[in-house]
Swiss-Prot record:
The EC number(s) this enzyme carries: 3.1.-.-
Protein name, as recorded: Endoribonuclease YbeY
Details of cofactor binding: Binds 1 zinc ion.
Function: Single strand-specific metallo-endoribonuclease involved in late-stage 70S ribosome quality control and in maturation of the 3' terminus of the 16S rRNA.
Family per similarity comment: Belongs to the endoribonuclease YbeY family.
UniProt xrefs under Gene3D superfamilies: Metalloproteases ('zincins'), catalytic domain
Catalytic EC class: hydrolase
Amino acid sequence: MNPELSLSVQYGVAEPRLPRWRLRRWAQRALDGAARDGLAECARAELSLRLVGQAEGRRLNHAYRERDYATNVLTFEYGTDPLGTARGDIVICVPVLAREAREQGKTLLDHAAHLTVHGVLHALGYDHIKARDARRMEALETAILTGMRIADPYA
């Protein structure tokens, strides 16, 4: 059985191409993929996803990572409680997302799907600090995106 998703979507910046239903679909696909992978052992995920502009993205990245620029996605993982509920917050900086999509020759939607999946996996405990963990996370992201007919973002 697939884990249940509770997703709160917040718009710090208007982005009509990224409606709640689309973000929710991508997040659920990531949650389902993580459940199949077996690393994320949760029955439920309570996540927030906030779309922000350049200034807020930069402020958050500086406050939490001491880097004075806006990054594409920030994730705050809060772990899984004893009842199996994973919690986390995901922040996607829309101007960085749009710029990267253009630079990489991707559609905004495909890149947004990738960043959403990436953020959800981080919220579930995946990381890419060690090379082995990075390979596992990237392979899972690619498999999830392939299931949505989105090309391998790492190719």
